[in-house]
């Protein structure tokens, strides 16, 4: 029997996937690259912020329509550097986005982790996957980053998971590089090797049909009470 755990803030409005944004009303959540212009990290972050009740879809559309807005200029520049398979040759790194997000939230609510031993944010691969599972069990989304042997890095938002035996955790994701299927809460599936402790390409991306490594994540923690305001127009952030 198929059993999966999904985050709390996902709904169907007719056949369309929706989430409750900043206003508390149901709004569009899935953003495909090209709708706002930009790279996968920015698109995944925007979906994360809607799922975390920090933004509404119309907030994003208003910024994208305003050609004088720094947000629009930044993501349009990234669109010009758009690479193959939804990657980017020069986009925002997840670690940098996490730092900027904490500035605009005025609190260290965003956390970034990676199992890449070349950085100081190192956790083991097993610990990284445990953090993904724990966050999803709390009903909260996770931005996950991966890379393949030759292709550029890619970022998606995990919104659910299932366990396929002891070895595999199957992640159900919103992937900005593709379309969302009719009456479905996800458009990509990534299998992670829960027992892997090395740098081998043992994870698998079903959308790109390629072996990858899920090696970094960004999560947003619950704010203290009262809830802190989120200022997407802060001059300290690049989007």
Which residue stretches match the model-derived regions?
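Generic hydrophobic segment detector
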Residues: 36-67, 81-122, 210-239
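Generic structural motif recognizing short loop/turn segments at the entrances and edges of beta-strands
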Residues: 1-2, 6-8, 13-15, 22-28, ...
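Noncatalytic regulatory segments and standalone regulatory/sensor domains
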Residues: 161-239
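Weak global preference for isoleucine
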Residues: 7, 17, 42, 50, ...
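Conserved active-site-adjacent core of cysteine acyl-enzyme catalytic domains
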Residues: 5-11, 76-196
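Active-site nucleophile-adjacent alpha helix/oxyanion-hole segment immediately C-terminal to the catalytic cysteine
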Residues: 1-82
């Amino acid at each position: 029997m198929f059993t999966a755990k999904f985050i709390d803030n996902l709904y169907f409005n007719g056949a369309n996937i929706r989430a409750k944004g900043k206003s508390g009303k149901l709004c569009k959540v899935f953003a495909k690259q090209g709708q706002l212009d930009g790279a996968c990290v920015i698109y995944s972050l925007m979906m994360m912020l809607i799922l975390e009740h920090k933004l509404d879809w119309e907030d994003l559309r208003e910024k994208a329509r305003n050609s004088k807005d720094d947000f629009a200029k930044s993501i349009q520049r990234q669109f010009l550097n758009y690479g193959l398979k939804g990657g980017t040759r020069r986009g925002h790194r997840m670690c940098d986005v996490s730092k900027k997000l904490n500035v605009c939230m005025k609190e260290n609510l965003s956390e970034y982790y990676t199992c890449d031993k070349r950085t100081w944010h190192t956790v083991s691969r097993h610990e990284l996957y445990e953090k993904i599972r724990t966050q999803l069990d709390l009903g909260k989304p996770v931005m996950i980053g991966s890379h393949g042997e030759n292709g550029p890095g890619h970022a998606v938002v995990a919104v659910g998971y299932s366990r396929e035996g002891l070895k595999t955790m199957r992640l159900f994701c919103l992937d900005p590089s593709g379309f969302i299927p009719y009456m479905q809460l996800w458009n990509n599936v990534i299998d992670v090797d829960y027992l892997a402790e090395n740098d081998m390409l043992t994870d698998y991306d079903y959308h790109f049909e390629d072996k990858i490594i899920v090696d970094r994540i960004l999560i947003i923690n619950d704010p203290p009470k009262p809830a802190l305001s989120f200022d997407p127009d802060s001059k300290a952030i690049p989007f």
